[in-house]
From Swiss-Prot:
SMART domains: EFG_C, EFG_IV. This is Elongation factor G, mitochondrial. The precursor is processed in two steps involving mitochondrial intermediate peptidase (MIP) and mitochondrial processing peptidase (MPP). It comes from Saccharomyces cerevisiae (strain YJM789). One of its GO terms (biological process) is mitochondrial translational elongation. One of its GO terms (cellular component) is mitochondrion. Keywords: Elongation factor, GTP-binding, Mitochondrion, Nucleotide-binding, Protein biosynthesis, Transit peptide. It comes from the Eukaryota. Disulfide bonds: none annotated. Residues 68-349 form the tr-type G domain. It holds the Pfam family EFG_C. It is found in: Mitochondrion.
Length: 761
């Protein structure tokens, strides 16, 4: 039983308000933390806070003032939750743009942050777009660096690299659909980079909207304590404003585009609900914040400021998310979110950022967001612009000046910052200097995504972002003879997007591109046509299979080759076995006693292992979760060399692999389908045909969401089938889940097909 439920005893109404009291004996008998544990372990956060406080001591008053007025935030959500529409209103209300334009380019202009024609046509965000704006709150001017990210799972790398450099985020949730599949993915990404968030429940003007159901899903599905700090005035099409629970005041948007904020008394019919939800907010905060818990135990009613302070502490600690609500399209409830960004999300001095000192055995170093410190910055995104490669940089320490020389820690190359700009979607504003905590872009720097730059006085390296494996591949051939533009396009796309991979298959003489899904690859093929005038023919999408083994197999292999003069000789003995812990990947180990194989030959064995794992013995796909142990062997005084042992290792691996009951593994995807209720039977029938395993079904007001696991190999063409089954009203998303063995008959077919191809050579 949760503490919150225990606390909610029947109460008498007193003058329209619920009195603040509780049974402290019952409350104190339980550990609050056990019910709503922070995503980050409490002890870890407290250690982090101590370090942050130590860093603050090194800041000058000017640094503190500059950081206090700065927020680096991202807008993240499931596709079609209204992120870009929300961002468009933010830019309008902060006077960054003079007119509001809609997604999909319905007004022939399109949303500011969707600068690509493809984004405006399809109504989706493909690349994360950066901008900056200013917001006045209580006479103080705050500076926001804002990144709008894609919602489609195929472009998840854009979310990864945005969250890597942001200090906070706004999680946008649809009031009708609630927490959806990509919401869960974004939540996981936020936890990976320890990014606190405020939540905005959008589309409150739509039929079937239910913000409190969405809040319940935040608690149950995302496992993060969440509570409303607002309630709506009116519902669906009659939505007219929101009630601020903390200040007990009604907020209305007036003017042609909701730019005028009017505050007034709370409507009488909403006062009971306001007090109920305000009390729930306080109880939830008492569950995650020590100071609020003490007041709760002492039966003191907290002041407005004390509630705000508790929300800020617990939000930054990533143990709570305040929930606001409104409708971006209806221009309702956006300005209070801007106030919440200032009030509850951290500034750069309140976030712990670390680097590794390459010159000191990679010792961990805490970065100080002070302009007088040595410069440290991370290149988190590359883009090909009209004036050459545009490199987005987050400055973590020191300052970056136009004309300065900076050093790439990975390559050791020193480069000059010829031009420094702030980005506003596809537009640029030249600046001379950028301080710590800021996000900017620069031209003429040759680097890779994830490289660290310093001023040369320190050798600090920052960890890069997580890059998921590609799951779909297809062959691509240019129609025209313009091979140079074809190569240019592929090279550029690979540099910009770490999840887009290109390789040349020497057997089929084809170029193979790999990515996160069909849409991901389709977008790049279309961009090649539009941006480089290269029409391409693509093959049928191919699944990226993996090969593995199920039982151990011993090996004792001798490689001999005599061709006159010095020959080749290498003998390796050991075991090939499956790896139980799938997080460890492939493992190569040696346990040689008495130096029977010298270290330089063992290093060659390791290289042979890595090489043979790239192309498995069954069907030529990568090997997964296999451990190779070499514990004995032999050398020849004259004939042994590195090549001999590399060859011996690869041959021993192939031989043992085929005796270890090998299996072909295929990617299993998490599938989420949303459709109107009348098509539920059709959708279930469609998934059953694909042999999908249905995990969960949620029925909403007028639509349902079905979650299932399904082999990727059966999902090609699913979009067409779903459109036919739902009269074009269904939508779905795919996300990689895990690898699982294929059915025996499928494995047999794949091996047979591979062997036929090999025989034709």
């Amino acid at each position: 039983m949760s503490v919150q439920k225990m606390m909610r005893v029947p109460r008498k109404m007193v003058g329209g308000r619920i009195p603040f009291f509780t049974c402290s004996k019952v409350f104190s008998g339980f550990s609050r933390r056990s019910f709503h544990e922070s995503p980050l372990a409490r002890s870890t956060y407290e250690e982090e806070k101590v370090l942050v406080d130590e860093i603050k001591q090194k800041l000058t008053p000017d640094d503190i003032e500059r950081c206090n007025k700065l927020r680096n935030i991202g807008i993240s959500a499931h596709i079609d939750s209204g992120k870009t529409t929300f961002t468009e209103r933010v830019l309008y209300y902060t006077k960054r743009i003079k007119a509001i334009h809609e997604v999909r380019g319905r007004d022939n202009v399109g949303a500011k942050m969707d600068s690509m024609d493809l984004e405006r046509e399809k109504g989706i965000t493909i690349q994360s777009a950066a901008t900056y704006c200013s917001w006045d709150k209580e006479g103080k001017n705050y500076h926001f660096n804002l990144i709008d990210t894609p919602g489609h799972i195929d472009f998840t790398i854009e979310v990864e690299r945005a969250l890597r450099v942001l200090d906070g985020a706004v999680l946008v949730v649809c009031a009708v659909s609630g927490v959806q599949s990509q919401t869960v993915t974004v939540d996981r990404q936020m936890r990976r980079y320890n990014v606190p968030r405020v939540t905005f429940i959008n589309k409150m003007d739509r039929m079937g909207s239910d913000p409190f159901r969405a809040i319940e899903q935040l608690n149950s599905k995302l496992k993060i304590p969440a509570a409303a700090v607002q309630i709506p005035i009116g519902s669906e099409s009659s939505l007219s404003g929101v009630v601020d629970l903390i200040n007990r005041v009604a907020i209305y948007n007036k003017g042609d585009n909701g730019e005028i904020i009017e505050k007034g008394p709370v409507p009488e019919n909403l006062k009971p609900l306001m007090e109920e939800k305000r009390q729930l907010l306080i109880e939830t905060l008492a569950d995650v914040d020590d100071e609020m818990a003490e007041m709760f135990l002492e039966e003191k009613e907290p002041t407005t400021q004390q509630i705000k302070d508790a929300i800020r502490r617990s939000t930054i600690a990533r143990s709570f998310t305040p929930v606001l609500m409104g409708s971006a399209l209806a221009n309702t409830g956006i300005q209070p979110v801007l106030d919440a960004i200032v009030d509850y999300l951290p500034n750069p001095s309140e976030v712990l950022n670390t680097a590794l000192d390459v010159s000191n055995n990679e010792a961990k170093v805490n970065l100080v967001p002070a302009v007088q410190q040595p410069f440290v910055g991370l290149a988190f995104k590359l883009e090909e612009g009209k004036y050459g490669q545009l490199t987005y940089v987050r400055v973590y320490q020191g300052r970056l000046r136009k004309g300065n020389y900076i050093t790439n820690v990975k390559t050791g190359k020193k480069v000059k910052v010829a031009r420094l700009v702030r980005m506003h979607s596809s537009e640029m504003e030249d600046v001379d200097e950028v301080g710590s905590g800021e996000i900017c872009a620069t031209f003429g720097i040759d680097c890779a995504s994830g490289d660290t730059f310093t001023d040369g006085s320190v050798q600090y390296s920052m960890s890069s972002m997580y890059v998921p494996d590609a799951v779909v591949s297809l062959s691509i051939t240019p129609n025209s003879k313009d091979a140079s533009n074809f190569s240019k396009a592929l090279n550029r796309f690979q540099k910009e997007d770490p999840t887009f991979r290109v390789k040349f298959d020497p057997e089929s003489k084809e170029t193979i591109i790999s990515g996160m899904g069909e849409l991901h690859l389709e977008i790049y093929v279309e961009r090649m046509r539009r941006e480089y005038n290269v029409d391409c023919v693509t093959g049928k999408p191919q699944v990226s299979y993996r090969e593995s083994i199920t039982i151990p197999a011993d090996f004792d292999y001798t490689h001999k080759k005599q061709s006159g003069g010095a020959g080749q000789y290498g003998r390796v003995i050991g075991t090939l076995s499956p790896v139980d812990d799938i997080t460890k990947g492939n493992i190569f180990e040696t346990a040689i006693v008495g130096g029977r194989i010298p270290d330089k030959y063992l290093a060659a064995c390791g290289k042979g292992f890595e090489e043979v794992c790239e192309k498995g013995p069954l069907i030529g796909h990568r090997v997964l979760d296999v451990k190779m142990l070499i514990n004995d062997g032999a050398i020849h005084a004259v004939d042994s060399n590195e090549l001999s042992f590399k060859t011996a290792t690869m041959s021993a691996f192939r031989d043992a692999f085929l005796r270890a009951q090998p299996v072909i593994m295929e990617p299993i995807m998490n599938v989420s389908v949303t459709s109107p209720n009348e098509f539920q039977g059709n959708v279930i029938g469609l998934l059953n045909k694909l042999q999908a395993v249905i995990q969960d079904t949620e029925n909403g007001h007028d639509e349902f969401t079905l979650k299932a696991e399904c082999a990727l190999s059966t999902m090609f063409g699913f979009a067409t089938s779903l459109r036919a089954s739902t009269q074009g009203k269904g939508e779905f998303s795919l996300e990689f889940s895990h690898y699982a063995p294929t059915a025996p008959h499928v494995q047999k077919e794949l091996i047979s097909e591979f062997q036929k191809k090999q025989a034709k050579k």
